[in-house]
Amino acid sequence: MIKKDYDCAIIGMGPGGITAAIYLKRFNIDIICFEKNSIASKVSKLNEVDNYPGIFGSGENLAKHFIEQVQKNEIPVVNSSVQIIQKNDDLFVIQTDEGFYNAKSVIVCTGIREKEFKIPGEDSFEKRGISRCAICDGALYRRRDIAVYGHKNTAVIEAIYLLDI
């Protein structure tokens, strides 16, 4: 059963999806948002955030601010996984675990999924030394011995960046 037609559907409620939702809501665009996990779930897992203007501390702290802003702006979020998005005439039909939704436009902000390194004991170092982004976290390892593990050119580019920190 289709609930109603929306002007825009936003898939993913990380920083990109939240920003899009805030701007659209401010312009009185009728939106519906979908997030299969919790709002800003990846952000909340960050150990330390020191590169986001106006926010200091943990990723949990930043995620808390994001959630407060979503609530303050009364942004509707359906906690459900989007299974299929299909164009049907002038509307997109969005199928979720909760049902079907129609929207005139769709913004996809699903982010990325990091590959597991598949190193024994990797889980025990989460938030305690394993990082997946030299630009994001490199400063945390300034003047320390580190190892870079990766695939092809990406690992080389990250290692070169870390040389200058």
Locate each region found by the language model.
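Short beta-loop-alpha junction of Rossmann-like oxidoreductase domains
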Residues: 41-43, 116
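FAD-binding core/adjacent interface of flavoenzyme oxidoreductases
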Residues: 1-11, 77-144
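Alpha/beta-hydrolase active-site loop signature
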Residues: 38, 50, 114
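Short glycine-/small-residue-rich flexible loop motifs, especially phosphate/cofactor-binding loops
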Residues: 21, 40, 67
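Rossmann-like dinucleotide/flavin-binding elements
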Residues: 2-6, 10-36, 126, 132-165
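N-terminal Rossmann-like dinucleotide/flavin-binding domain of flavoprotein oxidoreductases
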Residues: 44-100
